[in-house]
Amino acid sequence: MASTGRIPLWIIATFGGIAALTVVGLFIYGSYSGIGSAL
């Protein structure tokens, strides 16, 4: 968090949002393909 002043907040928010959507998408895809049941 020391370099927060050098990194724009919207970049962090965008990256966090994409990462969250990717994780949710993987869980949904895993549940449909049967991999999510093993987690």
Curated annotation (Swiss-Prot):
Pfam families: PsbJ (PF01788). It is found in: Plastid, Chloroplast thylakoid membrane. Keywords: Chloroplast, Membrane, Photosynthesis, Photosystem II, Plastid, Reaction center, Thylakoid, Transmembrane, Transmembrane helix. One of its GO terms (cellular component) is photosystem II reaction center. PSII is composed of 1 copy each of membrane proteins PsbA, PsbB, PsbC, PsbD, PsbE, PsbF, PsbH, PsbI, PsbJ, PsbK, PsbL, PsbM, PsbT, PsbX, PsbY, PsbZ, Psb30/Ycf12, at least 3 peripheral proteins of the oxygen-evolving complex and a large number of cofactors. It forms dimeric complexes. One of the components of the core complex of photosystem II (PSII). PSII is a light-driven water:plastoquinone oxidoreductase that uses light energy to abstract electrons from H(2)O, generating O(2) and a proton gradient subsequently used for ATP formation. It consists of a core antenna complex that captures photons, and an electron transfer chain that converts photonic excitation into a charge separation. This is Photosystem II reaction center protein J. It comes from Guillardia theta (Cryptophyte). The lineage of its organism: Eukaryota, Cryptophyceae, Pyrenomonadales, Geminigeraceae, Guillardia. The gene is psbJ.
